């Protein structure tokens, strides 16, 4: 487990950009943010709670599998992708974002590279299963909701 200073900075930038875009989405864009600044700020705070762990686990899953195959692997943010997502969310109230990718260097087979690529989405499916299990057990109850849904609804 080694995370360079650069990788930590890039993960942080991506999480912040995602949070800003989701905050814009929660109020319908820049005009909603200007009209309801408190809702914009609370939307950002609300979204960072499920987003940060889900995004981080997704990216680290790629890294762990790559490292398991003896590869160097680190997340690198895409500044253009992050800006595009924020601008899209600010203007239209929805977004598509290409936050970056885990860069992998080393000799891998096609099968190994496929497993590295699948590790992130599989980690999100597993997190969804954990969240679904918690909801099924009634553990989603929280006084902190957004749109009538607790945090696990979004995780």
Labelled PLM ranges:
Residues 1-155:
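Hydrophobic transmembrane alpha-helices and their immediate loop junctions
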């Amino acid at each position: 487990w080694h995370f360079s200073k650069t990788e930590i900075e890039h993960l942080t930038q991506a999480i912040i950009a995602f949070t800003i875009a989701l905050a814009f989405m929660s109020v319908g864009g820049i005009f909603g943010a200007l009209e309801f600044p408190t809702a914009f700020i609370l939307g950002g705070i609300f979204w960072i709670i499920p987003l940060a762990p889900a995004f981080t686990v997704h990216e680290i899953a790629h890294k762990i599998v790559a490292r398991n195959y003896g590869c160097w692997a680190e997340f690198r943010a895409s500044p253009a992708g992050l800006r595009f997502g924020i601008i899209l969310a600010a203007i239209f109230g929805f977004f598509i974002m290409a936050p970056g990718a885990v860069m992998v260097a080393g000799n891998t087979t096609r099968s190994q590279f496929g497993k590295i690529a699948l590790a992130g989405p599989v980690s999100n499916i597993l997190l969804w299963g954990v969240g679904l299990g918690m909801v099924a057990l009634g553990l989603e109850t929280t006084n902190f909701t957004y749109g009538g849904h607790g945090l696990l609804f979004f995780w």
